[in-house]
Amino acid sequence: ERNPHYVRLSDPGHAHKHTGLDNEGFFGIGVKKGEEYRFSVWARLPQGSTKETLRIELVDTQSMGERQALVAGNLTIDSKDWKKYQMILKPGSTHPKSVLRIFLTSKGTVDLEHVSLFPVDTWKGHENGLRKDLAQALADIHPGVFRFPGGCIVEGTDLETRYDWKKSVGPVENRPLNENRWQYTFTHRFFPDYYQSYGLGFYEYFLLSEEMGAAPLPILNCGLSCQYQNNDPKAHVAVCDLDNYIQDALDLIEFANGDVNTKWGKVRADMGHPAPFN
């Protein structure tokens, strides 16, 4: 319900051709020889077939050699219901700008949702974890306070696109996509592909704070959208209508510190942290 969109791959009807997707990450996906990367995807068979095959590759799109693939493998999709499929990719060479390629090699139809590629070796070994070198560099500073997720990003371009902490917790595959605050800020340069997945959410921020030994300082929206882009007072929430925003703050306290029998304390516990973050 919170994340209803998916992509459908079907046989194109042309011999020796396949339907697929490329994802270049942020100007390329850096991978290292011999390191393991966990690929996962939620998939289903919508049209009655019992088995379809996906080809998963990390490729060097600039290569003029006979093979572009740094590593490749097949996934068998075998369920009409949404199901998580995983595989480990281990590149045979290092490349700073690889591309993740997914294509359907069989003749049926497959629906895909929540495609993910993560290093296996993350900070503290968390599956939905942080890049190890960056998190370690942050921890080495020994911060006393860790403020998250930021300032302007909490406001959103408008209230509809504000950062909502409740959408950033729970199973990562159920967290909805949101526009990034700076997607259309500068009229001379739009960033139409600038989104945030909420894959890094308040649970992950609290966990990072705890593991670094820093006091967490969560920032919440108080009913204001970006004042730089919204001069009309009606773009913001009137004082008499702030109840929902106040409740969000109270619920966050419960999420961080509440007993596992409370609504939001249970969400935290179900994510793997029954003890309060305190």
Predicted features along the sequence, with ranges:
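Alpha-helical scaffolding within the catalytic cores
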Residues: E1-R2, S98, G129-D133, G199-Y205, ...
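Extracellular and organelle-lumenal recognition/adhesion modules and their flexible linkers in secreted
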Residues: E1-S197, A215-L217, D232-D243
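Surface-exposed acidic, glycine-flexible loop patches that form ligand/cofactor-binding
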Residues: G28-K32, A137, L207-L208, M212, ...
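Secondary-structure transition/capping motifs at alpha-helix termini
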Residues: Q47-G48, M64-E66, S93-H95, E211-M212, ...
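Active-site groove signature of glycoside hydrolases
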Residues: F103-T105, E113-H114, P119, P149-C152, ...
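Catalytic-domain carbohydrate-binding cleft regions of carbohydrate-active enzymes
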Residues: Y198, F202-L207, E211-G213, L220-D259, ...
